[in-house]
Structures are given as structure tokens and as C-alpha cells.
């Protein structure tokens, strides 16, 4: 399986995470996704809580790669809302920080991590049923023991977005 971003192989190929189960473990361990977007003011990046849907390749006819969709929420106005609605192409990054790797001299130090980097398309969710589903995915990921339920008033003042991740790679440094 290859989730390599189009056009460029990973420079340190030995650090690439290739298995669907290992990639999902990284996504599941992350609490925050950083979403990069571009508007007329320039490039910006915003950290967000997220939930996700995952489909393994075995369950996808004609696919050798897993499918990942991220669910995020926002208030009803602001720069992020404006750019997501105007320019849906985004890049994402999420990581699990594992700690400092010590060395015998300063340049031998490094950092252990596991990460996912990718690109996708943001879709604003309109229907109350799908907005509720998106919030449930976020809560299932971040607070699985929380009591379910969202009022119609909460749904009305919350924007929900689903980001279809089209290409992503996993990388780790132990």
C-alpha cells in the first residue's frame, strides 16, 4: 500500500508508516489536527479538535488505500469559516509527540514522533442529521464516555465541516 503524496517520494523512506492499522493508530492517538488554508490575506493554519471516519482498504472495492474523513466544528463566523466556504482545498497535519531523543552532542539530539500529513477538501454540512453525526464523531474520538445529545439550538449556532482527506502519509521517528 502506498499513501505517498503525489509527485514526491518520502525522503526518509525508512520512516514512512505504510500499514492501514498503523496509520489508524496514529490518527486515533492524535487530539488535534492543524488545518492549513489560503485566503486573500495569505496562508494560515488553525489547530482544531476533530473526530473521524476511517474505512480500511479491505472494505473498499477497488481501493488499496484506507479512506479518512475528518469532522471539525466552528462557530458561525470568522476567518476560518470564510476561507472554508470560499476555498475548500486544505492541508492537514497531526502528530503524537513521543519525546526528546538525546545524543552525545547538540546536533545528535532529535525528537520522537508519529505524524500524518495530507491534503483534502472541506465540505460544509447543512443537514441537522449530518451535523449531529459530525458532532457525535468528534465526541466519540475526544470524549467517548460523555453523554450523547445535542440540542437543535446548539446545532443552529455551530458549523460542522467534513474534510475528505484525498492523500495522506504517515511518518515516525522512534
Feature roles, as predicted:
Residues 30-76:
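Short beta-strand segments
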Residues 26-27, 83-84, 138:
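A generic structural signal for nonpolar/aromatic side chains embedded in well-ordered alpha-helices
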Residues 31-33, 46, 66-68, 86-90, ...:
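A generic structural signal for short beta-strands and their flanking turns/coil linkers
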Amino acid at each position: 500500500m502506498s499513501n505517498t503524496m503525489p509527485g514526491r517520494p518520502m525522503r526518509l523512506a525508512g520512516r514512512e508508516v505504510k500499514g492501514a492499522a498503523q496509520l489508524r493508530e496514529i490518527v486515533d492517538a492524535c487530539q488535534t489536527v492543524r488545518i492549513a488554508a489560503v485566503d486573500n490575506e495569505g496562508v494560515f493554519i488553525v489547530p482544531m479538535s476533530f473526530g473521524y471516519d476511517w474505512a480500511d482498504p479491505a472494505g473498499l472495492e477497488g481501493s488499496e488505500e484506507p479512506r479518512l474523513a475528518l469532522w471539525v466544528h466552528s462557530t458561525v463566523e470568522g476567518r476560518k469559516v470564510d476561507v472554508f466556504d470560499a476555498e475548500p482545498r486544505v492541508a492537514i497535519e497531526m502528530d503524537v509527540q513521543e519525546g526528546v531523543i538525546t545524543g552525545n552532542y547538540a546536533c545528535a539530539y532529535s525528537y520522537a514522533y508519529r505524524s500524518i500529513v495530507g491534503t483534502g477538501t472541506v465540505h460544509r454540512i447543512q443537514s441537522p442529521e449530518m451535523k449531529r453525526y459530525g458532532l457525535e464523531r468528534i465526541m466519540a474520538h475526544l470524549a467517548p464516555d460523555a453523554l450523547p445529545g445535542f440540542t437543535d439550538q446548539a446545532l443552529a449556532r455551530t458549523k460542522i465541516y467534513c474534510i475528505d482527506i484525498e492523500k495522506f502519509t504517515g511518518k515516525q521517528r522512534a
